[in-house]
């Protein structure tokens, strides 16, 4: 009995330590995709993924590692620190880093791999007396991103460094407000360099990037009819040029507004989303070029505007079939001198047949068409398509089940007889490969 009593304080201390660790456990999340493949001319290509779909159309290795922890919890007040690092490469070698040589291979690998800090922020709850349920946050983060998975198309997303209040209960829905920085490169707006000298004695000075701040207001979770909800939002981009940039400023560098309404309808255990978006000034380019709001085209011509209609979803079709789809139509008007109207349309379908809980066959077909009409009446068209057949093994039968390993074959073609493949020698190509994808 004395021996048992002797060890009781130690056991109590160990138990307390373990309980403390459990209470403040590190949350580990992530995403990755990687594989190997070949095309009709060397390694694989990536062709208009947002427009024709991503299955069998990705030639990279990409990964995200997210670590977060609740570091304080007392009297209903919590503080959470979140972080994420990302890596992107072409997957061409065993060792891929920021160096210039791959191991002992003479192949130069400068820029072979990129590393980025994607998130680092603090999220606090219970601090606001008027809204204890809301989250007060600051730092760099992914912010309420809306995307279509089958095409990797983010259509509503202002992620970046900023601050905000998220999830204030207001009637049936919740209000969120954020201020996020999304600068535009000097090269896109007024040129990378400015000549402060003369033509005879030039003196080129490198221009700074244009500071752009975005104010974002959203009202989400508005209930409508059965299994239907609505989310609406407004973004306002403020152009904030420096004194040195004011002489370079022209009428084109204007503030802009982006409005979004998203209707979500539950269907047979799946869902369908219809999205309406309208943008002015720099957001006209968001509508035309598959943007998401995280970049602002401040160089757009004064008075430019655009709109976009999106329909997408994933719906079960019986016990063994599921179907994912995307339909997009976007327009940008008078975005630069000589531009009258830019139209884009795309459609992607991804039906899937489940053989059992771990084995599935997937088809993905996508088509797009772009039309750029000039003020002189001429038009320039571009269109293309992709067809992919894949056999996949995944951790479950769901459309969203991951990890997944897939073997695929794809055919890609330009529909305007433009030789955009195989080093500019062919209007089409094929590619075959194996890819793994996971999120957790």
From Swiss-Prot:
Species annotation: Aeromonas hydrophila subsp. hydrophila (strain ATCC 7966 / DSM 30187 / BCRC 13018 / CCUG 14551 / JCM 1027 / KCTC 2358 / NCIMB 9240 / NCTC 8049)
Q: What is this protein called?
A: Maltoporin
Alphabetized, the UniProt keywords read: Cell outer membrane, Ion transport, Membrane, Porin, Signal, Sugar transport, Transmembrane, Transmembrane beta strand, Transport
- Indicate the family of this protein: Belongs to the porin LamB (TC 1.B.3) family.
Q: Name one GO molecular function term.
A: maltose transporting porin activity
Provide the site residues for: Important in sugar transport: 154
Per its record, what triggers expression of this gene product? By maltose.
Fetch the SUPFAM superfamilies from UniProt.
Answer: Porins
Record's subunit section? Homotrimer formed of three 18-stranded antiparallel beta-barrels, containing three independent channels.
Q: What does this protein do?
A: Involved in the transport of maltose and maltodextrins.
Renumbered to this chain, the signal peptide range is 1-25
One Pfam family here: LamB
Listed InterPro entries? G_neg_Bact_CarbUptk_Porin, Maltoporin, Porin_LamB, Porin_LamB_sf
Q: Name one GO biological process term.
A: monoatomic ion transport
Disulfide partners: none
Site (Greasy slide, important in sugar transport) residue list: 31, 62, 95, 271, 400, 439
What's in the GO CC field?
A: cell outer membrane; pore complex
Q: How does it sit in the membrane?
A: Multi-pass membrane protein
Quickly give the catalysed reaction.
beta-maltose(in) = beta-maltose(out)
Specify the superkingdom: Bacteria
Q: Where are the transmembrane segments?
A: none
- Write out the annotated subcellular location: Cell outer membrane
